[in-house]
Amino acid sequence: MKRIEEKEKAIMDEIMEMHALAEKAVELSFRAMRGDKSVVREISRIEQQTDVLDTDINYACTTFIALFQPVARDLRFAISIMRISSSYERIADIAQEISLYESKLPEIVFKAEKYLKKMFDAVKEGYTKTEGLKERMTELDNAVDEIYVEAIEQLEESCDVNAVLTVRHIERIGDLLAKIAARQIFIKEGRRVWII
């Protein structure tokens, strides 16, 4: 294995750790929304881990660019991975914020959990295979968006700011996962796509 491939593998190992941490934070945030506030401390710990990992990944990618002066796919990899890492870190931040809110949420909000889980699964698969990823993520992101719209309509008269923020944050997690998928396609195929 060439040094450049070894470095890419090391960076990818950290990205997969970020993926797992962000997914766990989101899973725990749904438990917190259901009233289990015992998970708040664990989400906070995960959020701190993602902060450190994001810094490590950005440093590793910057070093990768400086040492190897990559072109084409390798350059797309380094630049895109930094942005992907930041998206995972932001997802963990959002999950932490959600866990701190106290509010009564419409039941439809909890349907978003299964779609976000499917989005995480699709993104994980996207590191090895991007065929059909755009279409799959578009469909899942649209499902989360529809839940957001319906939940906001149900919350219109309640004036529950925490509930509105929670719903908005859930929709934002879907958007961030869609952006990660778009960057995966850019790395593999060299083309820019928008998943909206």
UniProtKB/Swiss-Prot annotation:
Its main location: cytoplasm. GO terms for molecular function: protein homodimerization activity. SUPFAM superfamilies: PhoU-like (SSF109755). One of its GO terms (biological process) is phosphate ion transport. One of its GO terms (cellular component) is cytoplasm. It is found in: Cytoplasm. InterPro entries: P_transport_PhoU, PhoU-like_sf, PhoU_dom. Keywords: Cytoplasm, Phosphate transport, Transport. Belongs to the PhoU family. Plays a role in the regulation of phosphate uptake. Homodimer. PANTHER family: PHOSPHATE-SPECIFIC TRANSPORT SYSTEM ACCESSORY PROTEIN PHOU. This is Phosphate-specific transport system accessory protein PhoU homolog.
